[in-house]
Amino acid sequence: MNIFDPQGPVAAADKVILIDSIAIMLAIVVPTIVAIFAFAYWFRASNPRAQYLPDFAHSGRIELVVWSIPALTIILLGGVAWIGSHQLDPAAPVAGTGSPVRIQVVSLDWKWLFIYPDQRIATVNTITVPVGAPIQFELTSSSVLNAFFIPQFGSMIYTMNGMTTQLNLQADAPGTFFGESSHYSGDGFSDMHFPVRAVPEDQFTAWVADTRKTGPTLDAAAYGQLSEQNRSMQAITYRAADPGLFTQIVTQKLPPGPGPSTGRPSLAVSPRSEN
């Protein structure tokens, strides 16, 4: 999970914003630290040249420095954040090569469901995408608030029950990358991570064809079983997926996941003795 090794245009832009922000803050922090040691050395008791001015009360020049430097820092940091947040709007399309790949994401307890509506397949806890193609994520939650994050691809986005969010990313190079939940969601939160395989276009096409040959079908009944709480779930591929399933999840026409029990996790996945 190396945010300083971006593998997509969004992550690369995020890195620039982070480095620019750190540089602006260091421009204040470093001189301040140097000044602390310089003042301590200059005003030491053994320095006869240091002037003691007990009646000193005000200096317009010092006031100008004290207020202008923090103000400029805030303006610069605010400008970087403002421009960057608008340029990297998660819903803004990413210019890539090839046809966009749509992936519908559902956060469950405690696993990730990925539906490929155009290919009519689905996976659990694993994603495969073509290198260079725009990846259009549409996200929701079947349980509590969660967050979807692939650090080397770019921005994090929240998933919420009964609504959707959008995220556009792109993989610049082939490889296997780390994806995770970055928002605490209960007892199995630490298990909500998944590999992201970025492959050339021809390999992606072959993977879709292979996935369609074997595996179960994802329909409302299968989703009902999948939405039950469980931990450390292995990756699954579905050879076929109901194209309207995601809409039914968002509009809550299907029963949502049970969610963590009131004040405590499900004993089925986290048995513990009462004190």
Across the structure, where does each feature detected by a protein language model lie?
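Non-transmembrane, membrane-proximal soluble domains of secreted or membrane proteins
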Residues: M1-I19, A40-N275
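Alpha-helical transmembrane segments
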Residues: L18-A45
